[in-house]
């Protein structure tokens, strides 16, 4: 009878005790599940912090150069400059004059060389060299040709030189002897009277007058002849 009034109190204690035990078990089970689960997602971004209070660090090394840029378009032309003063042409004109003079000398030497090449091999006698190109021409042209070649018309001053001229000419040729200044008085074209002669018999005879020049025949003898006639040119040079 005494226990009956206490029955509700006992039921409450058992109920609380049983509920507390279940809660602990649930708590253990819950903690076990959390420990075994994966990481959760990141939370929302926090607010920007305040600037730091430390010293500023050193500047870093420069970076690599970038690629060159594209070539720009040409700029607009600048203004035209003022007209300059006339140059001094005197020095240029002097140089041109000198060059022209040198060219004339070279041409003259070339012409001389070409004419010398036209002559056959000569014949040396003592200190003289006699040469011919075997061309026939009047005495005036023979004299001009030999002078242009810096020689003279062949003059035999002894029998040896006369023989050399005869062999070189291989035909009739003019000698550097005339009586143009005084008839009958034959002189060398270089000046002076004859010191040697080899006239053909009855020569010189001034046949028909006007035979003021001298030729050497095939046999080496001399004959007076008109200076307008044409015979071979033989020139002499110092050897």
Swiss-Prot record:
The helical collagen-like domains from three protein chains assemble into a coiled coil and mediate trimerization. Glycans are attached at residues 45, 48, 80, 83. It comes from the Eukaryota. Residues 35-88 are annotated as: Disordered. Residues 203-211 are annotated as: Calcium-dependent carbohydrate binding. Residues 1-18 form the signal peptide. It is found in: Secreted. Residues 38-50 have a biased composition (Basic and acidic residues). The lineage of its organism: Eukaryota, Metazoa, Chordata, Craniata, Vertebrata. The modification 5-hydroxylysine is found at residues 45, 48, 80, 83. GO terms for molecular function: calcium ion binding; calcium-dependent carbohydrate binding; D-mannose binding; oligosaccharide binding. InterPro entries: C-type_lectin-like, C-type_lectin-like/link_sf, C-type_lectin_CS, Ca-dependent_lectin, Collagen, Collectin_CTLD, CTDL_fold. Residues 58-74 have a biased composition (Low complexity). Ca(2+) 2 binds at residues 203, 205, 211, 223-224. SUPFAM superfamilies: C-type lectin-like (SSF56436), Triple coiled coil domain of C-type lectins (SSF57944). Homotrimer. Forms higher oligomeric complexes formed by the association of two, three or more homotrimers. Oligomerization occurs in the endoplasmic reticulum. Interacts with MASP1 and MASP2. The keyword Glycoprotein applies. GO terms for biological process: complement activation, classical pathway; complement activation, lectin pathway; defense response to Gram-positive bacterium; killing by host of symbiont cells; positive regulation of phagocytosis; protein homotrimerization. The modification 4-hydroxyproline is found at residues 44, 51, 62, 68, 74, 79. It holds the Pfam family Collagen. Hydroxylated on lysine and proline residues within the collagen-like domain. Ca(2+) 1 binds at residues 179, 183, 211-212. Disulfide bonds join 146-235, 213-227. It comes from Mus musculus (Mouse). Residues 144-239 form the C-type lectin domain. This is Mannose-binding protein A. Keywords: Calcium, Collagen, Complement activation lectin pathway, Complement pathway, Disulfide bond, Glycoprotein, Hydroxylation, Immunity, Innate immunity, Lectin, Mannose-binding, Metal-binding, Repeat, Secreted, Signal.
């Amino acid at each position: 009878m005494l226990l009956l009034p206490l029955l509700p109190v006992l039921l409450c204690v058992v109920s609380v005790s049983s509920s507390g035990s279940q809660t602990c078990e649930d708590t253990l089970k819950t903690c076990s599940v959390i420990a075994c689960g994966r990481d959760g997602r990141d939370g929302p971004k926090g607010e920007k912090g305040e600037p730091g209070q430390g010293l500023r660090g050193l500047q870093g090394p420069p970076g690599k150069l970038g690629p060159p840029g594209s070539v720009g378009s040409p700029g607009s032309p600048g203004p035209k400059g003022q007209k300059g003063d006339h140059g001094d042409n005197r020095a240029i004109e002097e140089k041109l004059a000198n060059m022209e003079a040198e060219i004339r000398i070279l041409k003259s030497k070339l012409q001389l060389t070409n004419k010398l090449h036209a002559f056959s091999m000569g014949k040396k006698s003592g200190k003289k060299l006699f040469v011919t190109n075997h061309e026939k021409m009047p005495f005036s042209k023979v004299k001009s040709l030999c002078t242009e070649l810096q020689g003279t018309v062949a003059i035999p001053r002894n029998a040896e030189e006369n023989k050399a001229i005869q062999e070189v000419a291989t035909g009739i040729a003019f000698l550097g002897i005339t009586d143009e200044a005084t008839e009958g008085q034959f002189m060398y074209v270089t000046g002076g009277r004859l010191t040697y002669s080899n006239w053909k018999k009855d020569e010189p005879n001034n046949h028909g007058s006007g035979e003021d020049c001298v030729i050497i025949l095939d046999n080496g003898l001399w004959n007076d002849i008109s200076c307008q006639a044409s015979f071979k040119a033989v020139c002499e040079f110092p050897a």
